[in-house]
Regions:
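Proline/Glycine/Serine-rich low-complexity intrinsically disordered segments
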Residues: 2-3, 7, 21, 26-283
Length: 283
C-alpha cells in the first residue's frame, strides 16, 4: 500500500575489477570523500519555475535511502534530500512510497512528478525517463568478518572463498565475471546474505556499498564485520550514476532539480546529509 506524507517545503566484462578514483569525490571530512558530480565552474541558472507542488515518489524499502520510519512516514537519505530540494526551491512537496518496479510507469502515467529512489542512470533507463544531474554513484564492496586476514580483495586472493551475494543482481554478474575462482553463494535477499556473513557461513559478502555501510554501522551487525577491498564502480554493471527521474520531456522540473542540487552541494548541505547517513564510508 502506498504511503503519502507531506514534506516541509548481457554485459562484456572489463579486463580487471575497476575501483573508484579518489578524484571522483569531494572530500568534506578527513578520510571521508563525499560523492558529487558538480563542477563549481558550471553553475546552473536559477529556473523560472511556475510549479506550486512537486509530487515525489520513492521506494518502499531500501535503507538507508528509503524506508518507513517508526511513525510509518517516509524516511531516509533520499527523502531528506527531497525535503531539502523543496526548501531550496520554496515549493510544497508530497512523498509517495511505491514499489521500485512501479516508479517509471507511475511517472509516465502522471501519478507522480519525480522519482527519487536510487534509480541508476543507464542507456535503458534513459530511454524511459529523463534524469537530473547525478547526485551519487553506485558502488560495490566486499565485506568480511573481523580478523579474517583479508586486507585486500583480488581475484587470486579469494580463490576458493565462498562469497555471499544477492541472486540475480548486477553484483552476482560482476562477481562471476571478474572473480572467476571464487565460489559465489547466492541468497534471495540482502538480509539473508548479511546474516550468512555475520554467522560465518561464508567467507565474504559482495553487494551494494551503501546498504552495507549502513549495516556495518548499525546494531544488527554488532561489529562483526568490516569492508575489505574496493570500492568497485564499473558503470556497465552498476550504472553511470544515480539521478532523480522525471517524465520524458519535463525539462522545467529537471532543470529546477539540477539547480537545487547544485545549491545544496555548494552550501555544504549535501555533505551534511551524507555524513548523517554514512558515518561508515561506503568508499
Amino acid at each position: 500500500m502506498s504511503l503519502a506524507a507531506p514534506l516541509a517545503s548481457a554485459l562484456a566484462p572489463p579486463s580487471a575489477p575497476l575501483a573508484a578514483s579518489p578524484a571522483a569525490a569531494q572530500t568534506a571530512a578527513p578520510g571521508l570523500p563525499i560523492p558529487g558530480f558538480w563542477d563549481p565552474r558550471r553553475r546552473p541558472e536559477r529556473p523560472d519555475l511556475r510549479l506550486t507542488l512537486i509530487r515525489f515518489m520513492s521506494e518502499v524499502d531500501y535503507p538507508p535511502f528509503n524506508y518507513a520510519g517508526p511513525d510509518g512516514n517516509p524516511a531516509g537519505f533520499n527523502v531528506d534530500l527531497a525535503r531539502a530540494i523543496c526548501d531550496e526551491l520554496k515549493i510544497a512537496c508530497t512523498m509517495q512510497m511505491r514499489r521500485f518496479d512501479t516508479l517509471v510507469e507511475s511517472l509516465a502515467e502522471n501519478r507522480g512528478d519525480a522519482a527519487i529512489a536510487s534509480l541508476a542512470v543507464s542507456a535503458e533507463t534513459r530511454r524511459k525517463v529523463d534524469f537530473s544531474d547525478p547526485y551519487y554513484r553506485p558502488v560495490a564492496r566486499f565485506a568480511a568478518r573481523r580478523g579474517a586476514g583479508l586486507d585486500t580483495v583480488l581475484p587470486e586472493r579469494i580463490e576458493g572463498k565462498t562469497v555471499a551475494v544477492v541472486a540475480g543482481t548486477a553484483h552476482e554478474a560482476y562477481l562471476r565475471a571478474l572473480f572467476t575462482e571464487a565460489a559465489p553463494k547466492p541468497y534471495p535477499t540482502a538480509e539473508e546474505a548479511r546474516t550468512a556473513l555475520a554467522k560465518g557461513e561464508v567467507d565474504l559478502l559482495f553487494g551494494d556499498g551503501y546498504s552495507l555501510a549502513f549495516w556495518l554501522n548499525g546494531t544488527e551487525a554488532s561489529g562483526c564485520c568490516v569492508f575489505v577491498g574496493g570500492p568497485f564502480v564499473e558503470s556497465r554493471y552498476f550504472g553511470e550514476g544515480v539521478g532523480i527521474a522525471v517524465k520524458k520531456g519535463n525539462d522545467q522540473l529537471r532543470l529546477a532539480l539540477n539547480w537545487a542540487l547544485f545549491r545544496l552541494w555548494e552550501k555544504g548541505k549535501f555533505a551534511d546529509l551524507w555524513l548523517k547517513y554514512f558515518p561508515v564510508n561506503p568508499f
